[in-house]
Swiss-Prot record:
Top-level taxon in the UniProt lineage: Viruses
Record's bilayer topology term: Multi-pass membrane protein
Gene name, Swiss-Prot/TrEMBL: US12
Protein known as: Uncharacterized protein HVLF6
Keywords: Membrane, Transmembrane, Transmembrane helix
Length: 281
């Protein structure tokens, strides 16, 4: 006897579909919070301090090499006697350090590491450019320029440290820096000088003021260095080149007002004679 089986609720010959697998609900993402212990914070502070000591030690080495070479050039009895060459040589000597400063800033923006060979090339070229100042002017002028530029660099570094370590005085320092340039312009405007003398000194003061702001920014970059960055030798050498070039350009700009009694009359007379020769030929 044949037994016939019936499928209840489904037609014959139809395969039963399996329900789609249901995955269990995924747990919420775990937020990883990095907890910096006191020992790690102390270790990073010590590492940052040692990095800054090496940084400023490199800058002091570069500056000392430049000063020593300039003193050797000052001891040479020969001096540049041609008025036009003596008056314009410091200006041409400023162009090379400015170009090197722009290249160092380009390296900083691109995060390119500095090398020891690049530091030596920077120091050699800049030292040659600065040492020519010792062949153009008296020793007293060069010494005064070094002292005044060093005081300005130390003052800018001190302001940067105050802005970094004392948040309450930051607004006062910014206000002081904002009002300083108009006060200097007003001081130049009330002097009984020739118009070209006022224009040249106003431009020089503006460049020195802008360089002070740049030096403060570079110092703040050093002080606010992120702990996540590795303190490599390449970053140290690149930053040292920036600070060194700031100090050199500050010295070259300070030379202009200190040598004003020397080159203002001669240079103005030379320009007047050249203009008269060109327009009344």
């Amino acid at each position: 006897m044949v037994q016939i089986q019936f499928h209840q609720g489904e037609p014959l010959g139809h395969k039963k579909e399996k329900p789609p697998p249901v995955s269990p609900p995924s747990p919420p993402p775990i937020r990883r919070v990095t907890v910096i212990t006191k020992d790690e914070d102390t270790l990073r502070s010590v590492q940052h301090f040692l990095w800054m000591v090496r940084l400023y030690g490199t800058v002091v080495f570069q500056t000392s090499a430049t000063i020593a070479t300039t003193i050797l050039f000052m001891l040479i009895p020969w001096r540049v006697t041609a008025p036009y060459l003596r008056d314009t040589l410091p200006f041409w000597s400023t162009l090379l350090p400015c170009a090197l400063r722009c290249h160092a800033y380009w390296l900083e923006r691109r995060r390119r590491p500095g090398t020891l060979m690049l530091v030596m090339v920077y120091t050699t070229l800049t030292t040659i450019s600065v040492s020519t100042i010792g062949l153009c002017f008296d020793r007293t002028v060069v010494i005064q320029a070094y002292v005044l530029s060093s005081m300005l660099c130390v003052w800018c570094t001190g302001l940067a440290w105050l802005m970094a370590w004392n948040m309450q005085r930051r607004l006062a320092i910014l206000c002081l820096l904002s009002f300083m340039l108009p006060i200097l312009w007003l001081f130049i405007a009330v002097q009984s000088w020739e118009p070209y003398q006022r224009i040249i000194l106003a431009l020089t003061v503006s460049f020195i003021y802008g360089l002070k702001i740049v030096l403060i920014r570079d110092t703040l970059t050093v002080l606010y260095r992120s702990p996540s960055n590795c303190y490599t030798d390449g970053d140290l050498l690149r930053t040292a080149m920036l600070l060194y070039m700031d100090q050199v350009i500050m010295f070259l700009l300070v030379v202009v007002p200190l040598t004003a009694p020397i080159w203002y009359p001669n240079y103005a007379g030379a320009l007047g004679r050249t203009a008269h020769w060109l327009f009344h030929k």
